[in-house]
Structure formats: C-alpha cells, structure tokens
A protein has these predicted regions:
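Electrostatic cytochrome c docking/interface patches
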Residues: 20-44, 55-66, 75
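Mid-chain, structured segments of secreted extracytoplasmic proteins
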Residues: 62-100, 104-107
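Short N-terminal signal/transit or membrane-insertion segments
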Residues: 29-30, 36-41, 45-48, 79-95
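A generic alpha-helix preference that emphasizes hydrophobic side chains
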Residues: 14-16, 39, 107
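Solvent-exposed, acidic/flexible segments
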Residues: 32-39, 43, 100-103, 115, ...
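Generic structural "secondary-structure junction" signal
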Residues: 26-28, 92, 112-115
C-alpha cells in the first residue's frame, strides 16, 4: 500500500508543477510612475470602463487624487460618479449576489492585483 501511495504521489506531483507554470510567456511592461498625465488617463479609463464591475475597495479617492496631483474638486466632478466622499474607499454599487447571477461569479476587486500577480500579468490581461 505504501508503494502504491508513493507511486501515486510521484506521478501527481510533476503535474501540479506543470499546472502552475504560465501557459504563455508574458510580454514585459515598462511603467513610468512619474508620468502623471498617463496615470491620470489610466484612472479615467479605469473609472469609466472597469469600475462598473471591478472595485478598488482598498484604495481611497483622496489617496489617488493626492498621488496623481488631481485637485479634490476635479476628482469629485470627473472621477467620482456616486455620492461617495473624497475620503471613501473606491467601491462599486453592484452586490456580489447580483454579480454571481449575472456573470456566474463576482468580479474580483482590482486593488491588489498588480502586487499579487505582477504588473506584467496585469498588462497582458488588459
């Protein structure tokens, strides 16, 4: 029985290593964090096209505005489309239960994706 278990483990372990490898090589991305105009454009794109489903619940509007050099009034008029305050987290209105019915699963929060999967993965995903 021990030999059967050992044989099974040695045949299954290599499969798990192959499953963890990326299916395709990721294209490298070079992000210039000092290019405020590009970062502001990315924020606009995210809030207009992604934030309807994907939240950024670990990020605050105020922090984004400060980091990107956006005045509070401009941020509230052009980026925040809800009744949220400048110090609120960037949440979405869609309930997870509704998302599960509509899409089969709740869309993931995107706050920490770059930290967890890396910027190359995120660039290739988008």
């Amino acid at each position: 029985m021990k030999k059967l278990f050992a044989a099974l483990m040695f045949s299954v372990l290599p499969l798990t290593a192959m499953a963890a490898a990326p299916a395709i090589p990721l294209e490298k991305v070079d992000i210039d964090l000092t290019d405020k105009a590009a970062m502001q454009d990315g924020l606009k794109t995210f809030t207009n096209y992604c934030m309807g489903c994907h939240g950024a619940k670990f990020q605050r509007y105020e922090r984004v505005a400060n980091d990107l050099g956006i005045p509070e009034e401009v941020m509230m008029e052009n980026i925040v489309f809800t009744d949220a305050k400048i110090g609120d987290h960037m949440r979405i209105g869609m309930q997870p239960a509704d998302a599960k019915v509509w899409f089969g699963a709740a869309p993931p929060d995107l706050t920490l994706v770059a930290r967890v999967r890396g910027t190359d993965w995120l660039y290739n995903y988008l």
